[in-house]
């Protein structure tokens, strides 16, 4: 249950759960920063341990029924997420924000296989969904002109998802983090040499090797971390 008291100047997160029909309630705010107003709490329809939380500053996820929360806003601006809903057929998480439109997290089903213990592993390769083989159709806009709108389709082929514990952190990301910790806001100029090195820096890559049942390599994918 998510509650708020912001109309009285109280922005603390109030989040509770019960496992005995409301006889006893437990606060489940571990991992949430202070003054994080909570708006909506939803539970996965297959794994009851998986919870999603909409807050004034983005989305959080819990893998253990709220005992610990993790910020879950990669690719999502730090915005007020006022409501959430789960599209059960596709396992999509749909977000409604305050003034910043709607967002959809496509197929979060891989999160069901994660636990707090598994996050300590060096890496995890998730079971992929069944991939469909088809001929993509190149369509047109008919006579509707600019009023016709369709969003971009997912890329053709199987989607392979993996988790790496210690992801690569670029020099620019490290610098921005250091600058964000400066209390007085007086950020020194890093120097042209440092900025040039940031631009020329290459990122680490993950190499995924795909083999058939006989152990023969059939494909190799390279993705930046």
Locate each region found by the language model.
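Glycine-centered tight-turn motifs at strand-turn-strand junctions
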Residues: 217-225
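Short, glycine-anchored, charge-dense loop/turn motifs used at functional sites
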Residues: 65, 212-216
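Beta-propeller blade termini and top-face loops
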Residues: 1-148, 155-156, 165-167
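Contiguous beta-strand segments within globular domains
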Residues: 135-205
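Beta-strand signatures of extracellular beta-sandwich domains
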Residues: 207-211
């Amino acid at each position: 249950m998510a509650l708020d008291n912001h109309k009285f100047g109280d922005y603390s997160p109030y989040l509770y759960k019960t496992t005995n029909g409301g006889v006893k309630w437990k606060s489940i705010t571990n991992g949430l920063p202070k003054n994080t107003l909570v708006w909506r709490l939803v539970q996965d329809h297959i794994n009851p341990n998986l919870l999603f939380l909409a807050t004034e500053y983005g989305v959080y996820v819990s893998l253990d029924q709220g005992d610990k929360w993790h910020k879950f806003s990669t690719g999502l601006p730090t915005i007020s997420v006022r409501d959430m809903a789960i599209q059960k057929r596709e396992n999509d998480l749909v977000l409604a924000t305050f003034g910043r439109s709607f967002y959809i997290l496509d197929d979060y089903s891989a999160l069901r296989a994660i636990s707090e213990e598994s996050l300590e592993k060096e890496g995890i390769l998730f079971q992929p969904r069944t991939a469909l083989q088809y001929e993509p159709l190149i369509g047109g806009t008919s006579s509707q002109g600019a009023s016709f709108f369709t969003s971009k389709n997912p890329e053709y082929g199987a989607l392979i998802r993996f988790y790496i514990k210690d992801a690569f952190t670029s020099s620019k990301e490290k610098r921005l983090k250091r600058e964000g910790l400066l209390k007085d806001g007086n950020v020194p100029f890093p120097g042209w040499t440092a900025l040039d090195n940031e631009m020329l820096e290459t990122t680490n890559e993950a190499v995924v090797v795909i083999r058939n049942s006989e152990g023969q390599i059939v494909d190799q994918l390279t993705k930046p971390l």
